[in-house]
Amino acid sequence: MDSDDNRTLSYEVVDHESDIGVIVYGKTYEELFSNAVYAMADLIVDVSRLKENRKMHEVITGKTPEDIMVNLLSRVLFYLDTYYILYYRITSKYSDGELDAYFYGSEIPEGIEYRNVIKAVTYSDLAVKPEEGYAKIIFDL
């Protein structure tokens, strides 16, 4: 199943000790993964100020949906830290242990204000539950 670009992206920020977390909503793995990418990017910068000018394709693997979530978001952080490109939108297909994803994003403009500097995605309190309509992710600041 393809994720739908026209859906309403929904997430809420949750406090977690000295870290920051999000709860993202969706009815499928694809929606949860997509909303998690957007939520993390929006925690980093105001995504509405970015102009989409980058696209890439990657297959993200993992033994569990939780592994895929951590690997996916860690990959987004890698591109931000290494190439100053923030991917904030994906379209994807998920099947057992594999997420085939197209990433869309932007080079980070000079002088843009960072909302948060996320160091890592954690397994702390991690949950990926499309059958219950949500995923919870905690980020190390």
Curated annotation (Swiss-Prot):
Question: Record's superkingdom?
Answer: Archaea
Q: Which GO terms describe its molecular function?
A: calcium ion binding
Residues engaged in binding Ca(2+): D19, D140
The answer to whether keyword Calcium applies is: yes
Q: Which UniProt keywords apply?
A: Calcium, Metal-binding, tRNA processing
Q: Which InterPro entries match?
A: Archease, Archease_arc, Archease_dom, Archease_dom_sf
Q: Which Pfam families match?
A: Archease
Its GO biological process annotations read:
tRNA splicing, via endonucleolytic cleavage and ligation
Regarding protein family, the annotation reads: Belongs to the archease family.
- NCBIfam families xrefs: PRK00407.1
Q: What does this protein do?
A: Activates the tRNA-splicing ligase complex by facilitating the enzymatic turnover of catalytic subunit RtcB. Acts by promoting the guanylylation of RtcB, a key intermediate step in tRNA ligation. Can also alter the NTP specificity of RtcB such that ATP, dGTP or ITP is used efficiently.
Q: Please identify the protein, giving its name as recorded.
A: Protein archease
Its source organism is Thermoplasma acidophilum (strain ATCC 25905 / DSM 1728 / JCM 9062 / NBRC 15155 / AMRC-C165)
